[in-house]
Swiss-Prot record:
Gene Ontology cellular component terms for the protein in this record: cytosol
Name of this protein: tRNA (guanine-N(1)-)-methyltransferase
Lineage of origin: Bacteria, Bacillati, Mycoplasmatota, Mollicutes, Acholeplasmatales
A Gene Ontology BP annotation from the UniProt entry: tRNA N1-guanine methylation
Cited function: Specifically methylates guanosine-37 in various tRNAs.
NCBIfam families reported in the protein's UniProt record: PRK00026.1, trmD
Record keyword ATP-binding present: no
Keyword tags: Cytoplasm, Methyltransferase, S-adenosyl-L-methionine, Transferase, tRNA processing
Gene3D superfamilies (alphabetical): 3.40.1280.10, tRNA(m1g37)methyltransferase, domain 2 (1.10.1270.20)
PANTHER family: TRNA (GUANINE-N(1)-)-METHYLTRANSFERASE
Length: 243
């Protein structure tokens, strides 16, 4: 997968590429990054890429021409161009999987200040948001998106690691424990020490559903619950009523 980033802060990504899973993916040639400094496409001696908005208003907007010129140079017929924006579709795990499986060349545009001249919208394929809040720039959101995508690339991490993640199966993850068995009088659930893999699997399944019920009930409203899941939820609700 090739990811190209258009930004006014190209050095923002330097340390990100040098750590953890991202660095490993680069070394394994699973991902190639290219970062483009928007100022190199300003076509003016001061490298200015922003200006005040027509019609008045606070702040500055990033200009349309630099983005257009950069896209003209790097975009391929098979590229997908996205803009990180609070107005975009909320990023989720399903979307991330689709991107990894379907996209070979991704171009990410980063807005700053009050955003980008709206004419850029005619040259993108999608707007993506990482949440209903405002950041100082798109670069942080880009890092989030890249991290989500890279860990799903085949061969970057063990597939079992992400197949058990929260949201991977429309539910939150079950609680996990490690050594010691007892600390501050808090014990690891006995079932996890039993060695009975079927019972452990069933316990984790139930706990995953329970976690989702208590922490993110909105998720359960969006999925078609199986008969087994409905039965487990009824038991949870029954125990709540009984105190």
């Amino acid at each position: 997968m090739i990811i190209e980033i258009i930004t006014i802060f190209p050095k923002f990504f330097d340390s990100f590429f040098e750590h953890s899973i991202i660095k490993r993916a680069i070394k394994k040639n699973k991902i190639i990054f290219q970062v483009h400094d928007l100022r190199n496409y300003s076509n003016n001696k001061h490298n200015q890429v922003d200006d005040s908005p027509y019609g008045g208003g606070a702040g500055m907007l990033l200009k349309f021409p630099p983005f257009y010129e950069c896209l003209k140079k790097i975009k391929k017929s098979f590229s997908k161009v996205i803009l990180l924006s609070p107005q975009g579709t909320l990023l989720n795990q399903k979307m991330a999987f689709e991107y990894v499986n379907e996209i070979k060349h991704l171009i990410i545009l980063n807005g700053n200040y009050e955003g980008i001249d709206a004419r850029i919208l005619n040259y993108i394929d999608a707007e993506i948001s990482i949440g209903d809040y405002i950041l100082t720039g798109g670069e942080i959101a880009t890092i989030v998106l890249i991290d989500v995508l890279v860990r799903l690339l085949p061969g970057v991490i063990n597939s079992e690691s992400y197949l058990e993640d929260s949201h991977q199966k429309d539910l939150l993850k079950y609680p996990q424990y490690t050594k010691p068995k007892i600390y501050q009088n808090q014990k690891v659930p006995e079932i996890l020490l039993s060695g009975n893999h079927k019972n452990i699997k069933d316990w984790r399944y139930n706990q995953s559903l329970k976690n989702t019920f208590f922490k993110r009930p909105d998720i359960l409203k969006k999925i078609n619950l199986t008969e087994k899941q409905q039965k487990i939820l009824l038991e949870i609700k029954k125990k709540l009523k009984e105190g």
